[in-house]
Amino acid sequence: MKRGFARPTPEKAPVIKPENIVLPTPLSIPPPEGKPWWLIVVGVVVVGLLGGMVAMVFASGSHVFGGVGSIFPIFMMVGIMMMMFRSVGAGGQQQMSRPKLDAMRAQFMLMLDMLRETAQESADSMDSNYRWFHPAPSTLAAAVGSPRMWERKPDGKDLNFGVVRVGVGMTRPEVTWGEPQNMPTDIELEPVTGKALQEFGRYQSVVYNLPKMISLLVEPWYALVGEREQALGLMRAIICQLTFSHGPDHVQFIVVSSDLAEWEWVKWLPHFGDSRRYDAAGNARMVYSSVREFAAEQGELFAGRGSFTPRHASSSAQTPTPHTVIICDVDDPQWEYVISAEGVDGVTFFDLTGSPMWTNVPERKLEFDKTGVIEALPRDRDTWMVIDDNAWFFALTDHVSIAEAEEFGQKLAQWRLAEAYEEIGQRVAHIGARDILAYYGIDDPGNIDFDYLWGSRTDSMGRSRLRAPFGNRSDNGELLFLDMKSLDEGGDGPHGVMSGTTGSGKSTLVRTVIESLMLGHPPEELQFVLADLKGGSAVKPFAGVPHVSRIITDLEEDQALMERFLDALWGEIARRKAICDSAGVDDAKEYNSVRGRMRARGQDMAPLPMLVVVIDEFYEWFRIMPTAVDVLDSIGRQGRAYWIHLMMASQTIESRAEKLMENMGYRLVLKARTAGAAQAAGVPNAVNLPAQAGLGYFRKSLEDIIRFQAEFLWRDYFQPGITVDGEEAPVLVHSIDYIRPQLFTNSFTPLEVTVGGPEIDKVVAHANGEVVEEVEAEAEEEGIRVPKVGTVIIDQLRRINFEPYRLWQPPLTQPVAIDDLVNRFLGHPWQKEYGSARNLVFPIGVIDRPFKHDQPPWTVDTSGPGSNVLILGAGGSGKTTALQTLISSAALTHTPDQVQFYCLAYSSTALTTVSKLPHVGEVAGPTDPYGVRRTVAELLALVRERKRSFLEYGIASMEMFRRRKFGGEAGPVPNDGFGDVYLVIDNYRALAEENEVLIEQVNLIINQGPSFGVHVVVTADRESELRPPVRSGFGSRVELRLAAVEDAKLVRSRFAKDVPVKPGRGMVAVNYVRLDSDPQAGLHTLVARPAMGSTPTNVFECDSVVAAVSRLTTSQAPPVRRLPASFGVDQVRQLAARDTRQGVGVGGIAWAISELDLQPVYLNFAENSHLMVTGRRECGRTTTLATIMSEIGRLYAPGATSVPAPPPGQPSAQVWLIDPRRQLLTALGSNYVERFAYNLDGVQAMMGELAAVLAGREPPPGLSAEELLSRSWWSGPEIFLIVDDIQQLPPGFDSPLHKAAPWVNRAADVGLHVIVTRSFGGWSSAGSDPMLRALHQANAPLLVMDADPDEGFIRGKMKGGPLPRGRGLLMAEDTGVFVQVALTEVRK
């Protein structure tokens, strides 16, 4: 039997250690210097003087130098000579002593020894590296079957692909030599160290006895020139080298020789087999006796091929495979018709004939002598380029004998590329219990006793755990098992992959494995999570089975779902780890062992079943989300200890899954579409499988690869022993074809006919005694009339009452109904104990926590620091729906007495759907500006009233208020008719742009309201749309899909970008402890649907909520009080009589009611003595003056000079009236009206008189402070200058009113009150009138009635606008309030 070989991951080769060696500098000895000239002169002079002295001594007859004394002249002469010839000065100091020179030589030699060791280490690393990739041919036979076999890869990264050793020779080392510094000259060079350095460089510049290689990808052919035996020995060595290191799928060989006996040994090598032709001995051997025969059989090899392209000139890094090596051992001129001078692309020739056709190209010639010395043109080691035109010594040739080659070939013949499973007979007879159902003892799939089935499997912690049959071996028909346990438990897992192209039966195999595991394990022990990147045809049939925790499909549609799925798996690992930690154990196996013992004692523990995660089409996942490879790899590594098993399936596997494949145990590989996919799956031969569904390879390890036929459980179901026609089924008996033994030679051996057993039809799948001849590749439609075995089993499994742990919640695609959400939040139906909630927490949606496997309610807590709520989101993000949901949620959890809502709908009309809720007091929008103003005014008045009443009743906080009013705590509470009140503003910016005055009031409520139970809920596109003073006033925050992620505060902006563009989707921060997560990472949220669950899923109106709540409560939120369209002066007076307020002018002229509190508005002379009124025609300006004059008559005594003075202490009034239209003549009698004018002359005259009167009231100089405060310098009535339609008087310096204008700012000193009306047209130019200008300077209140907003700002940032008759905006310095003027009849 042949053995399969699957290429393992290449082992790590020894690394070449490049070195950088700087040569040391040899010793330097400078030449000696000459004697100074003066020394010679001095010496000659001294010698001469000494000689003269001696001569004189002898001439004088003295005996000083006689006897012993004669020695002194001799010493003097010797001393002078030594002084002259010794080294002196600098020249003498440069001479080196011999001991010192020897020491320095020894030091230099030691340095060379150290460098020699460094260079030798680099050379040794080169030797190890070269011999790793190119071992001696004599060692190859022993290495056959080792992981080193067939390791070359044509991927462009393996630079040794196509490179083959031919001998050993010399190579320059991987050493960079640095020149010595300060190299001495030849004269100064110390000879010993210089010679040593020269010899060191000579011997260390070459590495000896290293493999020498040639490349198949550099030249189109090589000519081996020399003695024939030498050439044949080298060729045999080359063949052995290439067939060992290159697989038969990468390199194939062809021999064309006239001496076929010489090449008989190559029949053993799979590389010589023709993959297209077969004979009785297998693949036909590509050995031919002539060029003609070769061309006839392999002519198509050259069809369409271009010229040979060297590797360094190719545009592609990858090498096309298989590369063909043709050995030319026949001298035939017909070769010229086969190959040109440029060669053939993808083909390398080796010529052994020495024909000139092959040898006339020097760079393609390897010439060797009898001693085996090869000479060739030298090439660059890295680029393979020829660097010299003269042949050099290249190598000592390798040589392999025929005996050695045949031994090598016979050993290699045992191996096929992942074909250990191939036998002569492939058809299998299924006899007895060789199928899944028989293994489990199931006679009738439609009637399974699961209690008995699972009860009989008592070794759930033993060998049978996660061990299930899935098909049959192709060689002997035995039942084949998949054991998903870890390798250390004797299994094939814990994780594995399954691959197969379309039509290979992958989906069927996935179903078979899953259902077989279900049959072997009860749901308490085994759970599945079935995920499919696409439609889920393979896993959808298992819906509702108690083993299945969740079926997840269509993951490829949204990458966020993929990340969510991975998060859920991480959460399951964390959950299981926590369970194990709580029991004090390390892994799931130990935990279940402890649990089993505890249950035997009657004490149960939390279950921890095995979890098989099936991911179909995972390759698509990696394509869409490349980081998933690393994540799944980590999940696989950490999950194995907690019984989490991954089973990955895909149509193809590519290199990007390489890291994940390292952690995969078993591999079920069906037919692959490409060689690359088969290679990546670990079974390269899968590409050669026939197109037969369910046929594949089961790879347990590198050497244990089994060919199998998967069982088809989705076959038609019939009762046992009955065919489709209702007849008794026949028993099928099969035999195996027999082929006679054949003599194995290089020659073609024709197939003989079979001699044993009957012919049988091709069997694709066998199951339970039935023969299934055709099987669909993917999931097929369920039969209408005939049920399937698999579905029959699944239907029975669905009847089991078991609820699995759900580790996957539905994605946030459909919003939950509001009543379902509230029920989930309360833990009981919302109608039960309705209104018993004592907090102000409202659920508005769900939070998706895939890591925790749940979706808790998303709540807004408005009872504490989060009293005000800000809802941020871009346009279309669902802000208005969030408001509807919040209000509906409050309505289902609180009574209308507890919470009330007042809404300003500036975004859309959707909020009007909550208007009928008993909790809602008002819904107003831009089409009802008055309703908007009244709503704000009402709540602002409530804040002010509660400020007062809380002090009065001793209420310290809203918590105390709620306890007293709704919790039964003793103590008084204000009877204002409100509980917690919510001002809801949909689109804060729109309101701010429309009404500057109103938005300031809203801001006041935002800052002050929460302390008194008045909350504000606003929506905005951007946080910057809020006014700066109130941006920090929102303690609760709802972030939907943001218009600008910079506004994100709950999560980091990089997470906020992931919120999908879907209404209602948002994000909150992680609200649980997760050590591996950013605390500001986001959790996705979805706002609930503001409708009851009984309504269709596309209904977002609140009518159903209104109906449901109205059935439980009869209370109603107080409506917003509105100013009446008409309000009489008597009614104002009645209100004024009951008014107890302070500081608002109570007791004065009451002329209107305020919309803030529906209380009277007074002319508060303590603050300002004047009033201006403007508005368009028929707005009620004159009526305003009539009402004020009526009040003057009510409050003041007549003050005209024609009547007697009133009693002391009673104030009196004197009216100076300018009425061009004469409508106010009857408002007051002549006893009040001092002067009256209706034309210019009369006005001028009257103003002169008034000026004289006022001048007389000027305070004289020298008054004391007491006199000034008491205004004792004048007496008399208060003077009211009332001017109607001042626009009819000349403006500017021609205005007759300029005479009285100087006293406007000193009105309090002279008792003057100016009340003026003017039409609104041209108000921007009203400053030219001296009286109006003076009133502006005095900050007189301005009542703007019906006006044109296009006039722009009138005072501050306040504008006018259309108003009903009698209504106006009373503007003070920087505030404004709408008032309704009391109606007084005016003479027409």
UniProtKB/Swiss-Prot annotation:
Residues that coordinate or bind ATP: 500-507, 873-880, 1175-1182
Major place of residence: membrane
Stretches that traverse the bilayer: 38-58, 65-85
Subcellular location: Cell inner membrane
Chain ranges of the FtsK domain: 477-679, 855-1049, 1158-1351
Gene3D superfamilies noted in UniProt: P-loop containing nucleotide triphosphate hydrolases
Alphabetized GO MF terms: ATP binding; ATP hydrolysis activity; DNA binding
Organism domain of life: Bacteria
Protein name: ESX-5 secretion system protein EccC5
Annotated organism of origin: Mycobacterium marinum (strain ATCC BAA-535 / M)
Biological classification of the source: Bacteria, Bacillati, Actinomycetota, Actinomycetes, Mycobacteriales
